Every structure is written in structure tokens, then in C-alpha cells.
């Protein structure tokens, strides 16, 4: 505590310079409060306004799928190369070292499995636990046009309201029903609905035709899902096209941890997202880094 000795009056107030307050200039976040902007500034690189998320939350409904049998062996070596980790609270507490000091997007929906209807989800994490885990965002599926569309939207609304109370961003993940077409019209609808409900980030799929319309019509940042495993060159091309057409990053899982060389692949993805490398140049980087 400062004492009362030798107190000097302030003199240099720079009265000729107005005070500035630099906000985090991310799409759609200008009206958010300080705590939420601070969390978003950890997720999205403040210089590039982009992010490379490493998704390994698949086990919440798929179980120990290929590449995720042992998180501590297969995934932990990738942590240092990712901007953000996306996982469940069970894996976070049991496997992820706190000292890794990476922002976490916490999977907050669940209660389903690959043996049942995927759209039948519930909120699976209380907001106070997300805060306790020092998460930078919470994520939940929204299934537009599916059997349980109404409940999935209610889940998102519940999380958004809880997040606003504590400054926690919510990422809405556009799940696709079994009979839904993966096209621009559908994803424009799904992403816009989630944003209108108040989600601060949207995770959706890249489509070859019309993705720029999806990104332009969504008032908050979009990150693309990696989806099924693709050949490395194709996955990097998808990344490049998505960023070029307005995405604010990627949230990839299988296309990284099921790669021939996961470390080389995440480095190549990073080059596309943050350094605007073409898919061809990034693939050359992948080959040069490949062990």
C-alpha cells in the first residue's frame, strides 16, 4: 500500500490530446462489454482478426474415434501450435495441462450419441463451470430444420443469456440434419438465425458455391468446420477459399489430427489463416515440415 509521504500533485495531463479507448475491432463485437471483448481477443488474433482452433471434442457423441483414442498422446503435441483448443470439460480437466495457457472454447451441449438422433441435444455445462474453467467461449450445436430444431435453438438462447451475464461469448455450431442439403441457402439460414439469437461466433461448413454470401449475411465472425477427413491439399484449399471469401478462421479436427503429419498440417493451416498463403504454398510447407 502506498504511504502518505512525499505526495506530489500531478502535472502532465496531456490536455492537448483527447483520451482514446481502442476497442477490439472484430466483426459484430463493437457493442459488447469489456470482458466479452477481452475473451474474443484471446480467441481471434488481435493483429489478423483470425483464428486457428483445434477441435477435439468429437468424443462427446462419437466416443474414441480414430485419432482421439489417447488425447494425451495424439493431441497434446498439437496444443502449442493451435490458437484455441475446443474440447469438453471432461477432457479439459483430465488431460489438458493448465500451464499450456491456451484459450479454450468449451463444448457445452450434449446428451446424444451416434446411436440416436444427433439433433436431440441439451445444455450440458452450467455457465458457472465454464467460468470456473477459465473458458473463453462456450459452444453448442444448433440444428435448423431438424427434428429437434426448437430445443437446439432454446439451448443456444439459454447459453447466450447466461453468457451475457458473465461476459462469456457463445459459439453456435450449425449441425446438419440427416436429410438437409449442405448448400448456401441452408447455411445462410442457419448462421443468420444463430446470430439473430445473439451468438457471438458461428461455426459452419464451407460450401463451394455461395460461401461469400453466407459470410456477408452473417453479422458476426464465422469459423469453418473441417468436416470429414480430406487429402491435405484439398483441406488447405478449402481453408484458403473460406478465408478469401470472408471466414474469420477455422475450427479443424479430423483434417489435422488424422493427417499423415498433424504438426505439419496445423502449421500449414496457420500459414493460410494468418499469413494469407495460398493452398499451393501451404501444401509445400506441409511437405517440407512433414517428418
Curated annotation (Swiss-Prot):
InterPro entries given in the database record: Aldolase_TIM, DeoC/FbaB/LacD_aldolase, DeoC/FbaB_aldolase, FbaB-like, LsrF
Matches recorded under Gene3D superfamilies: Aldolase class I
Entries under SMART domains matching the protein: DeoC (SM01133)
GO cellular component, as recorded: cytoplasm
Record field: catalytic activity: dihydroxyacetone phosphate + acetyl-CoA = 3-hydroxy-2,4-dioxopentyl phosphate + CoA
Superkingdom of origin organism: Bacteria
Cellular localization per UniProt: Cytoplasm
Task of the protein: Involved in the degradation of phospho-AI-2, thereby terminating induction of the lsr operon and closing the AI-2 signaling cycle. Catalyzes the transfer of an acetyl moiety from 3-hydroxy-5-phosphonooxypentane-2,4-dione to CoA to form glycerone phosphate and acetyl-CoA.
Name the record gives this protein: 3-hydroxy-5-phosphonooxypentane-2,4-dione thiolase
Organism the protein comes from: Salmonella paratyphi A (strain ATCC 9150 / SARB42)
Phylogenetic classification of the source organism: Bacteria, Pseudomonadati, Pseudomonadota, Gammaproteobacteria, Enterobacterales
